[in-house]
């Protein structure tokens, strides 16, 4: 049997390790309902912000300063945040951490596929797992599928035949984020 709080590590890492939970210190006990509403709003706003960041970096050709294109990015980012998943999971605010981390993981995959540095992918996966290990794991599974999409899309338009290098590179970088989180098991 676990003692000295050992059983609490699983509870903490599943329910409580979101950085937004630190905001609870700013609220009185009587304002708990307000706190939950603020957290939901902040997490959905963070989802919109990370998706806008993803769109700006992934589709750099959109960054010509055009008001129409920036309005489209804002529209798509807000649409992502208030999608059915985002609204439905407002009842389970712990799932929203993976929701706002997903665009950063997608951008990390894009950068690795296109020969960029893998730091963003590793750090994003590590943070997603840190914030909620279950959704972080789901995000890792999605990252594998997203890699296949980005890889196929990239090779379709570039005609690059040196695919093995990218395939060999993506798996360790995705796993690095998981390895960073191994401290929880000790």
Regions picked out by a protein language model, each given a short descriptive name:
Residues 28-39, 64-76, 117-120:
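Membrane-interface starts of transmembrane alpha-helices
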Residues 159-186:
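Hydrophobic alpha-helical membrane-interfacial segments at the cytosolic entry of transmembrane helices
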Residues 22-27, 58, 112, 130:
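Alpha-helical structural context
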Residues 56-68, 112-116, 156-167:
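Membrane-interface helix-boundary motifs at transmembrane edges
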Residues 1-48, 78-99, 138:
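Membrane-interface coil-to-helix junctions
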Residues 25-28, 125-126, 174-179:
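Membrane-interface segments at the starts/ends of alpha-helical transmembrane spans
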Residues 44-54, 69-153, 181-186:
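Membrane-embedded helix bundles of polyisoprenyl
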């Amino acid at each position: 049997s676990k003692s000295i709080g050992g059983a609490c590590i699983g509870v903490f890492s599943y329910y409580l390790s979101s950085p937004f939970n630190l905001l609870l210190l700013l609220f009185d006990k009587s304002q708990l309902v307000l706190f939950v509403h603020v957290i939901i709003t902040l997490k959905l706003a963070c989802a919109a912000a990370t998706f806008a960041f993803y769109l700006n970096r992934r589709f750099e050709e959109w960054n010509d300063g055009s008001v129409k294109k920036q309005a489209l990015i804002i529209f798509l980012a807000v649409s992502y945040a208030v999608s059915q998943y985002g609204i439905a999971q407002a009842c389970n605010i712990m799932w929203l951490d993976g929701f706002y981390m997903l665009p950063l993981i997608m951008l990390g995959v894009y950068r690795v596929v296109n020969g960029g540095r893998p730091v963003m992918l590793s750090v994003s996966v590590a943070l997603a797992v840190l914030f909620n290990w279950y959704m972080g794991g789901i995000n890792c599974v999605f990252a594998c599928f997203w890699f296949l999409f980005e890889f196929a899309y990239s090779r379709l338009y570039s005609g690059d035949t040196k695919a093995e290098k990218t395939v060999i590179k993506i798996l360790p970088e995705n796993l690095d984020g998981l390895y960073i989180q191994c401290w929880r098991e000790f």
